[in-house]
Amino acid sequence: AARRIAKRVAAIRTGDPEPPPERVREALADVVGRCIYGVDLNPLAAELAKVSLWLETLDPGRPLAFLDAQIKVGNSLIGATPALISGGVPDEAFTAIEGDDKKIAAALRKQNKAERSGQDDLFGDPGSALPASVGGRFGQLLGTSRAASLADVHARQQRLKALEDDQTLQRQRLVADAWCAAFVWPMESGAPKAVTHGRFRALQRGEPLGPETLAGVHQLAKDYRFFHWHLAFPHIFRQEGSGDGSGGFDVIVGNPPWERISLDDAEFFELRAPEVLGVGTTAKRKAEIDGLALSRPDVYAEYMAEMRFGQTLSRLFSKSHLYPRAAVGRLTTQALFTERILHLVASRGKVGLVIPTGVLTDTPMKDLWAWLVDSRRAERLLDFENSKKIFPIHASYNFTLFTANGGSPEVDSRLEVAVRLSSVGELASPGSSFCVNVEDLRLINPATRQLPLCRDQREIDLLIRITRQANSIPKRGWVGFTSEANSKDYVDVYREAHVPLYEGKMMHQFNPSFATYADVGVDDRRSGKPRRTHPSEASCPARPRFWAPESTALSFLATKGLPSTEWLLCVRDYARASDERTVITAILPRTVP
């Protein structure tokens, strides 16, 4: 990014579209010193980013660029905003999770609710905007020309420290830290007094928190590395006179981490205690993990601490209203980063991301996608299959080069789409992508605005024409046929009064015996990998992996209001977007849950 900007700057300065290399290097030093920003959770990664930029701008006889004010350390997903601070601490912050005392959590929630409706809150936010003068001083520091000597670098370091130590900025940072801390506060006996709404408002008015609570806020800020963008870069996010941080970055590009927020048992125990992963069901694995409290107390304590850390993050992400569209279902960093970044870019800015396609197309992300379409932020979605192993993930895993804007009202209403690409070079081929108007997406899929599975412009135009001219099919309720019984009741050998537990992978189109666990090895059975049936077995019922109590199955069917017929038409729950058939059905006996 820095090289591209530098070449353009040099071209403008020289009037030559292909400027001399020395003028590009000169421009690159200015670009790095004024335009490039970054945040990383890992301090070492932040330092390596600086080193990389220094190597790019190395100029013998001149000091390295001063980057301390631009490359910073912190968790860029966890941070308050002026608008959320203005709203105070919501009651949902005190939702009990693993390790919390439910009675204490309930009491804090009740206290918070009373404080939110009390007289102290009648006049709202006591003030959360940072004076424009603070941002102006940061802008002046970064707007100066490149340091000519080591003394200039030291002078800038001292100026930055003075700005960071500004009392107004420090107070606002404490307020923002306290707001975040409320969502990850330990609700247990002996813990310091939590940051409830009343204490938070008092802090905003300049009243002290109390030594124990203050120490707790500082410790949590250190542990979770809260990062408040509007305070870290006040010259980028202007606040005075607005209800939220306005402004933002002109361009944001990146490939955010693709991870789940929740703790992955397999990843955690793979090296620490692999024996707990060798059991069949979730319930059995949980029992094995609980047994570590006696056999391996150190591993168990570390596991519980990691699990609580993940749950506190989930509570903050889902209850704080930081991510109203992306913090749904199983939380992932890629979805959260996508929504976060779209709020960090300026209204006339641009965003370019490499993200899993599911961030934009999966059902849990329907609200995020609908917002992107309705606000006309989405501009380009180039979907790639990983068949050439661009990323170290499964070949069938799709990722997208996603381009968006900051919400400017002057943008085009068309969205460019390409699907199932395997290389960037394919984009040069005619017809490799198609365009669709966002108004047509509302027509085709009014509920979620989801993209139809079209391969070229001809298919999307035909679908739009059919949708406009044909009558729509009325909505009809249907019942998802799945197993909702508790896995602790499952058994892996047949018992009397038990029925087979049927899995979607065991059926295919009009074929209830597509796969079976009969004569399957222990490892494949444990990992849920049935074998394909032979044509000679077509008339035989597929052998399941587990059986469930018949009473559990009948109770489940009754709650779903299913008919009392002996046979039911079942729909397979999952299908790949690339499958020829995305609705796979078979007829199964009613005795199969």
What are these regions (language model features)?
Residues G349-V354:
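Conserved beta-strand signature within the Rossmann-like core of class I S-adenosyl-L-methionine
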Residues R23, R325-T332, P356-L360, K389-I393:
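Alpha-helix capping and helix-loop boundary segments enriched in small/acidic/polar residues
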